């Protein structure tokens, strides 16, 4: 989806099954969108076979919600689900299919994001293979991934100088530390607990969004 790089900016909210149990799943997702989330990723680690129907229904509903709010919908780690629900974007990790293989499968019909953890060379390779954006982190201790290694904020500065793609920062991001990541070069902040663990999801999303509204150009 050439020309859509501008879609990767602002608050990038990521769903969590524990923080968003099924009875309130869509309501909490919509609250984040009302609060200004520009991107919403469906991240669900349920079994792709036994949970297939639920995953398909949730992903399809999120795609419709995102379209209603003008936000980008992303499926995490599941190319088949992305195709089934017509997701406009797919995010993968280092263990998943490489960007070149996904690009061959989907063509330019989908945005592809790649987790690069703390590796700028890995991000450069992803860019060469056709990725549309790259993600780095965890930058801080993360309640969602407590075992994830913490990487230096300097990675963002180095990547910004060497890679001509939108950059997403992830991992333990809060309203207090997010501004420094934006200043270092992050185009978007990917947040799970900071948004969906909040009692007021919409309010939390608005505060994260304000970090971008208030940044110096």
UniProtKB/Swiss-Prot annotation:
Binding site for 2-[(2R,5Z)-2-carboxy-4-methylthiazol-5(2H)-ylidene]ethyl phosphate: 142-144, 172, 192-193
Signal peptide limits: none
Alphabetized InterPro entries for the sequence: Aldolase_TIM, ThiamineP_synth_sf, ThiamineP_synth_TenI, TMP_synthase
Binding site for Mg(2+): 77, 96
Protein name per Swiss-Prot or TrEMBL: Thiamine-phosphate synthase
Keyword Magnesium attached: yes
GO cellular component, one term: cytoplasm
GO molecular function, one term: thiamine-phosphate diphosphorylase activity
Pathway participation: Cofactor biosynthesis; thiamine diphosphate biosynthesis; thiamine phosphate from 4-amino-2-methyl-5-diphosphomethylpyrimidine and 4-methyl-5-(2-phosphoethyl)-thiazole: step 1/1
Binding positions (4-amino-2-methyl-5-(diphosphooxymethyl)pyrimidine): 41-45, 76, 115, 145
Keywords attached to this entry: Magnesium, Metal-binding, Thiamine biosynthesis, Transferase
Gene name of the record: thiE
UniProt record similarity statement: Belongs to the thiamine-phosphate synthase family.
Listed Gene3D superfamilies: Aldolase class I
Cofactor(s) the record lists: Mg(2+)
A Pfam family it matches: TMP-TENI
Keyword Magnesium recorded: yes
